[in-house]
């Protein structure tokens, strides 16, 4: 308890220092620009790694930075500094002002609209400092690694266990009078091992992450899951080239919807560089599927009271009954499109994709015969056409049951068709991502094998 109270007092002191830094920068810029915005952050924590129970690395870090953007006569200049002394802040502000003199005027440039700002940011319960000493952190990492190593004699090597615990302070202010900040924590534990059988070697990992230590799985759970995942990959086979149904396991299904983020981002829309350019208000997913955004989810890993421009975040339906309801807009992209910012400067905030109640095992039965994808490789996705082609590994399924692991295959399709034809989304929700969804069943994809 004493350690946690010490961290809390340190963070409160840091926050006051950061607020003073932001106020100083804004004051220096106020008479020399039409508008300004300042963001400053400080992250402190410990990272520990072990291998065969021995300490590999113990790293303490305390990193901070201030960034300022000024706007003058529709010209924009930005500068940053890791030194928060008054003299350094003054130099940084002047550097931003100097840069603005040489940039081209842009009528869409400027501070976020005042009526959209989060002048009263809510507390989202993101701050849970850990009472973990370096010795305890080392023990947690070693236990996770050891649990994996002891699970099976086929596990012959290890890449180690790791534990991370960090707390951070973010403060944002602008020339509209906004000055808000919040504190947050993030803790994680992981392990990675190598298994060997008949000359074949495979590796995999497992991890747990949360805002509070109490949200983490035990080291023994991490090790056991790591061992299970690694052993399941042994003796993979290759597939013949074919077309077949595909299940994206939950941890890769999040990426399937991650491509939607880029496709509906305001920057892609005003540049006309997205295959969903004419899709606003149209159906792009099955009519039973809705994507909700919950930026104020308590303790959420992607929760935030405001975006990186100070715009307040709000609960939204991104997709409603399969229909795309809005673009993801920053202040700049919104002005380019004649719209208002949606609070998405810096990314998305806790997307939730509701499943249809089927377990993963029930989805296997529904698919019958086909491919389960558990790993994806490469970046073969076109933002212009939606064409999708990526290296994959996973498991072959027959009669609703997993038969054997597969590797060295490529799956291909087009995202428009893939999204529109989703058969079902499972109830095995992956909660460790900014996109929370279960496994996804597609009726057919091209599979390129041997």
UniProtKB/Swiss-Prot annotation:
EC code: 3.4.-.-
Keywords tagged on the record: Cytoplasm, Hydrolase, Metalloprotease, Protease
SUPFAM superfamilies (UniProt xref): Putative modulator of DNA gyrase, PmbA/TldD
Keyword Cytoplasm appears in the UniProt entry: yes
Function: Metalloprotease involved in CcdA degradation. Suppresses the inhibitory activity of the carbon storage regulator (CsrA).
Family: Belongs to the peptidase U62 family.
The protein, known as: Metalloprotease PmbA
Species for this entry: Escherichia coli (strain K12)
Organism lineage string: Bacteria, Pseudomonadati, Pseudomonadota, Gammaproteobacteria, Enterobacterales
Gene name linked to the record: pmbA
């Amino acid at each position: 308890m004493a350690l946690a109270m010490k961290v809390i007092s340190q963070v409160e002191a840091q926050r006051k220092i950061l607020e003073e830094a932001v106020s100083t920068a804004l004051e220096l810029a106020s008479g020399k620009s039409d508008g300004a915005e300042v963001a400053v952050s400080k992250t402190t924590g410990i990272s520990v790694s072990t291998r065969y129970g021995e300490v590999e690395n113990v790293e303490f870090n305390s990193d901070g930075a201030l960034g300022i953007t000024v706007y003058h006569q529709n010209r924009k200049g930005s500068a940053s500094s890791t030194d928060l002394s008054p003299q350094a802040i003054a130099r940084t502000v002047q550097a931003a002002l100097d840069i603005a003199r040489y940039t081209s005027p842009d009528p869409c440039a400027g501070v976020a609209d005042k009526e959209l700002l989060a002048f009263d940011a809510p507390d989202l319960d993101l701050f849970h400092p850990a009472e973990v000493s370096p010795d305890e952190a080392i023990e947690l990492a070693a236990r996770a690694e050891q649990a994996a190593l002891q699970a099976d004699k086929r596990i012959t090597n290890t890449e180690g266990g790791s534990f991370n615990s960090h707390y951070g302070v973010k403060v944002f202010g602008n020339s509209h009078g906004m000055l808000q900040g919040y504190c947050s924590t993030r803790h994680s534990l992981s392990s990675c091992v190598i298994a060997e059988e008949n000359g074949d070697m495979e590796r995999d990992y497992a991890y747990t992450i949360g805002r509070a230590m109490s949200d983490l799985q035990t080291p023994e759970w991490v090790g056991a899951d790591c061992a299970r995942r690694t052993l399941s990959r042994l003796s993979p086979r290759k597939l013949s080239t074919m077309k077949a149904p595909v299940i994206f396991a939950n941890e890769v299904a999040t990426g399937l919807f991650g491509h939607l983020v880029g496709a509906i981002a305001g920057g892609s829309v005003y540049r006309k560089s997205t295959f969903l350019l004419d899709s606003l208000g149209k159906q792009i997913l099955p009519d039973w599927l809705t994507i909700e955004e919950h930026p104020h989810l308590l303790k959420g890993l992607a929760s935030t009271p405001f975006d990186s421009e100070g715009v307040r975040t709000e609960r939204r339906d991104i997709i409603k009954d399969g229909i795309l309801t809005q673009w993801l807009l920053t202040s700049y992209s919104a002005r380019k499109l004649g719209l208002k910012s949606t609070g998405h400067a810096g990314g998305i905030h806790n997307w939730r994709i509701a499943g249809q109640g089927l377990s993963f095992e029930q989805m296997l039965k529904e698919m019958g015969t086909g491919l389960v994808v558990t790993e994806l490789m490469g970046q073969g996705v076109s933002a212009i056409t939606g064409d999708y082609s990526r290296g994959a590994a996973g498991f072959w399924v027959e009669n609703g049951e997993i038969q054997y692991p597969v590797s060295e295959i490529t799956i291909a399709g087009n995202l428009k068709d893939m999204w529109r034809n989703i058969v079902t989304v499972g109830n095995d929700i992956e909660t460790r991502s900014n996109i929370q969804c279960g496994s996804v069943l597609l009726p057919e994809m091209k599979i390129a094998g041997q």
